[in-house]
Every structure is written in structure tokens, then in C-alpha cells.
Amino acid sequence: MKRYFVTGTDTDCGKTFVTNQLVNYFSDSAAIKPIASGCEYSENQLVNSDALLHQQQNHLPMEIVNPWRFRLPVSPHLSAREDGASIDVHKVADYCLNLQVNDIKKLFIEGAGGLMVPLNEQDTWLDFLKLTRIPVILVVGMKLGCINHTLLSQEVLEINKIKCQGWIANCLDQDMLMLDENISTLEAKLNYPLLARTNYGGKISDICLSSL
């Protein structure tokens, strides 16, 4: 089974939406969100709204889709601490590397926030990637400032020799000035391909998804 880690340039760049679109596109795929904060109680269990979308799409138990759940809508290390817990990055890595789902050939693993979001006092998602070496799909929320955020993300990945499979332009605002020019700038400056584009909450537009 191929595994991909879906991360983003920042919070609210559209990782969950894009991940759902990828699962819709690939009929032999599923998605999980191993760590989520901002969970609320529903039917006597903590539920994260993003993870719930994956669970409803995959028809998998929530315990498989989202095993690490915390209440406060803050960085995972802070939310876990407030719940009297801590996140062991090695356990998260083992879980994501060893999870098997029947008839699934592609597993999309959605992170929380960006690459440098802390999971505990020492480790970030980058440390998770160093342990797992799972290829990255970078979701770029197309808005003012995205070029800077995207190039910084590329630098972090390259310095740490983490493979990036490609990036997806998630067009958040149909009125964004010079949207196509911004995408062209990123295509010229990034060292990995533009896989797809999503337009204002619409379906994913295939550009190079066959490489996955």
C-alpha cells in the first residue's frame, strides 16, 4: 500500500478538503487524520470534524481514522497537555506505517497544521517524517503570502531530505488577484510537480495525479 502524508502551508489551507477530493478521485484509497485537536464530545466520544469527514467517506471506525484526539483547538502538544496526555511520535509513526486497510492501495495521512507544528515538547511533524520517510503532498492555500510559506516548506523538506511527491493548488478565493500568475510563479520555483488544482470548493482538476 502506498502512503502519502498530506501537509499544508498553514492552518486552514484546505488539507481536509483536498484529502477528501483525493479519496474521491482514487477509488482504491482511504484517508486518516491520526492526530486532531479541537474535538468535541458526541455520543460519549471525542470527535474532530475533519476526522469525521474522513470517517464518513471511508466507513472506517473512528478509532482507526483518528486515534489521537484532544479537546482544545490549539497546537496538538498544547491540547494534549491540557488533557493530561502526551503524544509519542514513535507510536504515531508506527501506527501510520503499519496500518492496513482491506482493498486499499493508497492511504492519505492528513497532518495537523504545517510541517513544524509541535507534537510534543521535542518533536514536530518533521520528526514524524524523518522516522517514516513517507512522501509528502503539499497543499498550498492560494492566498496572499502563499509563495513565501510554500518556499519555506520546500526548504525544510529539502534540507531534511524528505521526498515531496508534489503540490496541489487549493484555490480558496475566486477573487484572488493574479491567481494564475501566483500558481505559475510557484511552478517555476518549486522543485516538484503541480499535481492538481481545486477551484473554490469544486472538484479536483487532475494535472499530474497519475504519478501517485
Curated annotation (Swiss-Prot):
Catalytic reaction equation(s): (7R,8S)-7,8-diammoniononanoate + CO2 + ATP = (4R,5S)-dethiobiotin + ADP + phosphate + 3 H(+)
Q: Name one Pfam family in it.
A: AAA_26
Extract one GO BP annotation from the record.
Answer: biotin biosynthetic process
Alphabetized UniProt keyword annotations? ATP-binding, Biotin biosynthesis, Cytoplasm, Ligase, Magnesium, Metal-binding, Nucleotide-binding
Q: Does the keyword Ligase apply?
A: yes
Major enzyme class: ligase
The UniProt record gives the binding positions of ATP as: D12, C13, G14, K15, T16, F17, D50, E110, G111, A112, G113, N170, C171
Entry cofactors: Mg(2+)
Q: Which positions does UniProt annotate for substrate binding?
A: S37
Record's subunit section: Homodimer.
Q: Which family does it belong to?
A: Belongs to the dethiobiotin synthetase family.
- Free-text function comment from the UniProt entry: Catalyzes a mechanistically unusual reaction, the ATP-dependent insertion of CO2 between the N7 and N8 nitrogen atoms of 7,8-diaminopelargonic acid (DAPA, also called 7,8-diammoniononanoate) to form a ureido ring.
Name this polypeptide is given: ATP-dependent dethiobiotin synthetase BioD
Question: What is the protein's species of origin?
Answer: Legionella pneumophila subsp. pneumophila (strain Philadelphia 1 / ATCC 33152 / DSM 7513)
Supply the source organism's classification. Answer: Bacteria, Pseudomonadati, Pseudomonadota, Gammaproteobacteria, Legionellales
Per UniProt, what is the name of the gene that codes for the protein in this document?
bioD
